Amino acid sequence: MGDPIVEPRSSALESSSLSSDRLSSKRAAHLELEDGTRYEGRAFGANRSISGEVVFATGMVGYPESLTDPSYRGQLLTLTYPLIGNYGVPARNADDPLNPGFESSRIQAQALVIQNLSPDYSHWNASSSLEQWLIEEGIPGVQGIDVRALTRRLRDNGTLRGRLLIDESPDRDEVANSPYQDPGSRNVVAEVSCTEPILHRCGNEGAVRVILVDCGAKTSIVRSLIARGADVLQVPWDHDFVAEAGDAVLLSNGPGDPKNAPETVDNIRRALAGSRPLMGICLGNQLLALAAGFDTYKLDFGHRSQNQPCVEVGTARCWVTSQNHGYAVDGTSAPEGWEEWFINANDGSN
């Protein structure tokens, strides 16, 4: 593979108006990609090394929501906005499973890769700093990385696996000498789905019931359905939802390759023979497509941001959408009687 390519530490960190002696850590760390590229930085958060798939997200805000999004399971999340952590982490209600400001009950990303970590935070609803939260959840991070250079490499070469190696972590050598972890090689859906049905009531008598097939569902989906006057029956990814009573079925978002969840595809295929409406979001869309006879494929670097433009096929109408997935539906594989409804305006994918 040749000598490793070493990218310099981000100069933006050195020139920041934030005093470097107030930053949380002097621990040396580096991000190592499978193509040999190496990015030097400093560790923060939990003191552990980790391996996974390196991806990037281009949103300017929303790091608590992104970190807790189950679609990031097994991934080292790179945030392209240069200053992260300045508004802290929202307060959490232990009695509310649908906490606003979070997409699940825990951080799902393997690690966080950023340019600058804000040493201070300020927000009326903040209860802790970003670093304190990462430590509590056992999630490592690295700052001082030139995230623009890293993003360009991922954009131009496709998503790569990588290792975050922290010099002082007790597991550094073990992670450094182990194969790169690839979430696409296993069924990560089973790792993030609920394990038994959960009924969320909206409080309206006679409300419609939506069956939410949880393949890694974000809590904002449940909150949105409840706000629209629907009861939500959340069921595990491999649950036989066809036998459940309900007015519609929503196939949730989630992590990984849709082809690693054949049980869900089989259930959807049986449901398509009925008359009940089915809808899919991100991974759910891909699972629905597989059940209908389409093929799916891995995108070069995925769609991960709050500003993905989608065009309704056959019209000039465009919606700006929030997306987080690394796979897409192959529109050229459409079976008879099916056609694409929306495509991504950036790359034409479904």
Give the location of each predicted region.
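Phosphate-binding active sites in nucleotide-utilizing proteins
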Residues: R209-G280, L287
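Conserved beta-strand segments of alpha/beta enzyme cores
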Residues: P140, D231-L233, D295, V320, ...
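Short, Gly/Ser/Thr-enriched beta-strand-loop segments that form substrate-interacting elements
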Residues: G337-A345
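RNA-binding accessory domains that recognize and position tRNA/RNA substrates
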Residues: G2-P236, P258
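Acidic surface patches and DE-rich sequence motifs
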Residues: L33, E312, N344-A345
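Beta-strand-turn-beta hairpins that frame and shape the catalytic cleft
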Residues: E205-V210, T315-C318, P335
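Short, surface-exposed beta-strand/loop micro-motifs that present aromatic residues
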Residues: G348-N350
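Cysteine-nucleophile active-site neighborhood
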Residues: S252-G331
